[in-house]
Amino acid sequence: MRLLFVLLCCLAGAAHAEPARTPPPKAYLTLIIDDLGQNLPRDRRVLALPGPVTTAIMPDTPHATEFAREAHRAGKIVILHMPMDPATGPYAWHPELPLEELQKRLDAAFKMVPYTAGINNHMGSRMTAQPVAMAWLMGELQRRHKFFVDSRTSAQTVAAQQAQKIDLASVSRDVFLDDERTEAAIFNQLQTAISLARKQGSAVMIGHPYPQTLAVLERELPKLKAQGIEWIDIKQMISVRSNKATPAHGKNGIYR
């Protein structure tokens, strides 16, 4: 009788036990810092950030080659921050240039920035809206085994769309951290990226090596893990997204 009573108590306890909690869905962030190569002491703060930051280096800067080598030695992913119209300079792409000149400028830019795994556009609101040039670029990057990051400096961009058409490894930016250059605004943008990552599973951030941006990142990035956020590098993010557009950039995974 006593044994029966004990068994009944155990069964009653099991009936009221809390159900096993399902782990929260994964939330991934990746970070690109643009406009590098201009100021070595400043840019080295980017290399000291505690995680897999992607370094986007401009070819027409005084320290482009040297900093690319430093970033590579530091284990950071290096990408070419390719100037595009309305950017100016000897490497900049403009819609009126023939494809032969675009290739010449791209070749020269890659020579200035060694160890590149891919590229993203610097400015480029006019250039990334050009279907023919963007289709050519994506084919060229595929030939070179490099990926593309669409900075989405314009709502009219067709760059990621053209990359997706040929299944080139690519991803699009979700959040600019520092359009407003104050620590409070940058912190808020970081929180926006974190919220977006929780909502859609991932978020791609782009920032710049401004003192305010670096101060916020140095303070807040070490806290990501405790917030349930996994900071991954850009190659991992491309894999996570599988070349699919997020709802903000397309429909049913297809870029519009």
Residue ranges and their predicted role:
Residues 5, 16-256:
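Catalytic-site microenvironment of enzymes
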Residues 3-12:
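Sec-dependent N-terminal signal peptides
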